[in-house]
Amino acid sequence: MEHQSLFSFSNPEFWVLAALVIFFGLLVVLKVLPGALFGALDGYAAKIKAELDEAQQLREEAQALLADVKAQREDAERQAAAMLEAAKADAKRLAEEAKEKLEEQIKRRAEMAERKIAQAEAQAAADVKAAAVDLAAQAAETVLAARLAGAKGDTLVDAAIGQMGAKLQ
């Protein structure tokens, strides 16, 4: 087997190489290959840039949305904390009001009971005094009746009893 040089005119690979160089040379001279090749590359680059721009825009929108959601969550947490504090304050206020009302009601009932006790004591004292007056009047009547017997005694006893009853009441 004989080895032929690549640059030999009898070598078919030389002619394929030459045809290929001439073909690409014509394409470059006629500006077919660079325009088509660079146009395709430019179109692909523009498409990639548009996708990157869109991705960047979507990322910025997502970050803005995330920040908005975080702000809303923080606001909701603040509102919930404020509502909880208000509820605690209301519960404390209502408990204090209920305690005050209960104390006032107990005080009123105690005062009412004291008034009833005072009235009962006054009534009992009046009843005892009236009974003592009646008993003293009966005893005096009996004693005077025994000492003064006769017509003159009856008039004196009646006058004394009348005066005693008026003075005691």
Swiss-Prot record:
InterPro entries per record: ATP_synth_b/b'su_bac/chlpt, ATP_synthase_B_chain
A GO cellular component entry from the record: proton-transporting ATP synthase complex
Disulfides per UniProt: none
GO molecular function terms listed in the Swiss-Prot or TrEMBL record: proton-transporting ATP synthase activity, rotational mechanism; proton-transporting ATPase activity, rotational mechanism
Record key words, sorted: ATP synthesis, Cell inner membrane, Cell membrane, CF(0), Hydrogen ion transport, Ion transport, Membrane, Transmembrane, Transmembrane helix, Transport
The organism's place on the tree of life at top rank: Bacteria
UniProt-annotated location(s): Cell inner membrane
Entry keyword annotation includes Membrane: yes
Record-annotated membrane-spanning stretches: 14-34
Topology class, membrane: Single-pass membrane protein
Entries under PANTHER family matching the protein: ATP SYNTHASE SUBUNIT B, ATP SYNTHASE SUBUNIT B', CHLOROPLASTIC
Quaternary structure annotation from Swiss-Prot or TrEMBL: F-type ATPases have 2 components, F(1) - the catalytic core - and F(0) - the membrane proton channel. F(1) has five subunits: alpha(3), beta(3), gamma(1), delta(1), epsilon(1). F(0) has three main subunits: a(1), b(2) and c(10-14). The alpha and beta chains form an alternating ring which encloses part of the gamma chain. F(1) is attached to F(0) by a central stalk formed by the gamma and epsilon chains, while a peripheral stalk is formed by the delta and b chains.
Protein family according to the UniProt entry: Belongs to the ATPase B chain family.
HAMAP family: ATP_synth_b_bprime
Annotated protein name in UniProt: ATP synthase subunit b
Annotated organism of origin: Caulobacter vibrioides (strain ATCC 19089 / CIP 103742 / CB 15)
Gene: atpF
